[in-house]
């Protein structure tokens, strides 16, 4: 895997290699790895922000899609890149934190040591949703139903070890509901299964179900964090629980060892893009909220989430 990733990283760097003997950074194109397929919400976000960053730095930002292994391939490419500021990535916590804990053979990196945080870019809440005609109309009723009907409440997620699966496990720990996580190969199959009556709930990124929520086909039960378009949907904290659900966050990173002066040029340009009102307006309909957080706070969040995910994974028997 590392040999393969190294070869791909080499081809990526050649494609966007800066002029030799550059006097000041940046003097050439910067490659932006997008570890997901074209058309994904992260891809749309990355391309919108790349245009803004290019204007700020006055050099081209070249988006390069490198999907595969749930985003892990793109992250590993970054870890193989030279720490010169000419290769960065926009990646989410599913590939950075969750996969590195659950599948270290494929996700052969440590998000705490193998990357240089450059700034949080955006968040998308996770939502627990049920069909609009479900007999449980709120979180309390859902938990009561699950306890009275052990093993009967199946909850679809986007895959094994996904953010949604860990949300289900968090709810089970907090309430004793005994919800059964059912992994699908992505969000769309899970939504289809719920609408078709094959499962009783889903936990997915909010943006994947907003249309169904507005039509009444689905009903939201709880969110990982507040979202302005659905102000009445509660969070776990508002329901009296101390452990929040996991949301989805996306952030910019460079390779480990990125020089401070290079990061000092990148960070303000990325911050400008993340705080752009035009970009925020473009992404909001996708269920994405732009939110800037500086590198030190981003690293602290990664440490905390890494600890939580690892703890749940061990208690659930997912890892030793």
What residue spans do the PLM features occupy?
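Stable alpha-helical elements in mature extracytoplasmic
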Residues: 41-45, 49, 70, 74, ...
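Solvent-exposed coil/turn segments that connect beta secondary-structure elements
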Residues: 93-94, 123, 133, 160, ...
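N-terminal (or domain-start) structured segment
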Residues: 22-114, 152, 160, 175-203, ...
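Hinge/capping helix and adjacent helix->loop/strand transition within the periplasmic-binding protein
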Residues: 30, 77-86, 101-189, 236, ...
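C-terminal lobe and pocket-closing loops
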Residues: 123, 209-275, 304-307
């Amino acid at each position: 895997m590392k040999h393969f990733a190294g070869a791909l990283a080499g081809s990526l760097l050649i494609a966007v290699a800066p002029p030799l003997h550059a006097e000041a950074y940046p003097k050439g194109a910067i490659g932006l790895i997008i570890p997901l397929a074209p058309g994904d919400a992260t891809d749309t976000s990355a391309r919108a922000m790349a245009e803004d960053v290019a204007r700020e730095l006055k050099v081209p930002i070249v988006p390069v899609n490198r999907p595969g292994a749930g985003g892990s391939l793109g992250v590993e490419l970054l870890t193989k890149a030279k720490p010169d500021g000419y290769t960065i990535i926009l990646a989410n916590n599913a590939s950075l934190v969750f996969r590195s804990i659950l599948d270290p053979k494929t996700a052969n990196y440590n998000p705490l040591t193998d990357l240089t945080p450059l700034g949080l870019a955006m968040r998308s809440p996770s939502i627990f949703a049920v069909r609009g005609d479900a007999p449980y109309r709120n979180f309390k009723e859902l938990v009561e139903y699950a306890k009275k009907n052990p093993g009967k409440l199946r909850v679809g997620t986007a895959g094994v070890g996904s953010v949604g699966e860990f949300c289900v496990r968090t709810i089970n720990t907090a309430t004793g509901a005994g919800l059964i996580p059912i992994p699908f190969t992505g969000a769309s199959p899970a939504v289809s299964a719920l609408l078709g009556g094959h499962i009783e709930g889903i936990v997915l990124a909010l943006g994947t179900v907003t249309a169904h929520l507005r039509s009444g086909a689905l009903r939201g039960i709880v969110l990982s964090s507040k979202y302005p378009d659905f102000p009445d949907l509660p969070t776990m904290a508002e329901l009296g629980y101390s452990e929040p659900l996991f949301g989805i966050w996306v952030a910019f990173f460079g390779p480990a060892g990125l020089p401070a002066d290079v990061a000092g040029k990148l960070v303000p340009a990325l911050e400008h893009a993340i705080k752009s009102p035009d970009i925020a307006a473009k992404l909001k309909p996708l269920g994405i909220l732009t939110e800037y957080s500086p590198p030190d706070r981003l690293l602290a969040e990664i440490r905390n989430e890494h600890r939580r995910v690892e703890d749940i994974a061990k208690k659930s028997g997912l890892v030793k």
